[in-house]
């Protein structure tokens, strides 16, 4: 199984794991489950960190590298197909990062781990 983490889920893994349902933690820790973080999430965290809206205990690049090395996290790049697919995505959600993450989960056939209730309005295999 391929699991794509929404940005807040990635941050909660480090700072508030109690907010994540146990079945998602089990998937995250399952060696047979490939866990991904979108480059869109990294971009979002960098912007929020620079604006003072997100405080990190490590520089972002170190945080990402640590999770990749320690937990096998993989980075999902942004492809042109992901961008073009946004054209057909209904506008239930206005956040550009969430919209891109949603499209990536759809096109890459990934389960999307997110507490964002707006995602239920889309054809995505979401879990929470």
Kindly label every feature range from the protein language model.
Residues 55-58, 70-115:
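Active-site neighborhoods of divalent-metal-dependent phosphate/nucleic-acid chemistry enzymes
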Residues 6, 44, 98, 116:
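Acidic active-site catalytic centers that drive phospho-/nucleotidyl reactions
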């Amino acid at each position: 199984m391929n699991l794509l983490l929404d940005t807040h889920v990635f941050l909660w893994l480090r700072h508030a794991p109690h907010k994540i349902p146990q079945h998602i933690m089990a998937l995250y820790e399952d060696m047979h489950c490939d866990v991904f973080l979108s480059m869109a999430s990294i971009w979002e965290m960098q912007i929020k960190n620079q604006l003072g809206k997100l405080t990190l205990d490590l520089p972002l690049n170190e945080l990402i590298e640590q999770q990749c090395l320690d937990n096998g996290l993989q980075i999902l790049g942004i492809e042109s197909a992901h961008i073009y697919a946004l054209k057909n995505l209904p506008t239930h959600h206005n956040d550009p990062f969430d919209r891109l993450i949603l499209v990536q989960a759809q096109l890459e056939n990934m389960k999307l781990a997110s507490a964002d209730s707006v995602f239920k309005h889309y054809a995505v295999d979401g879990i929470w």
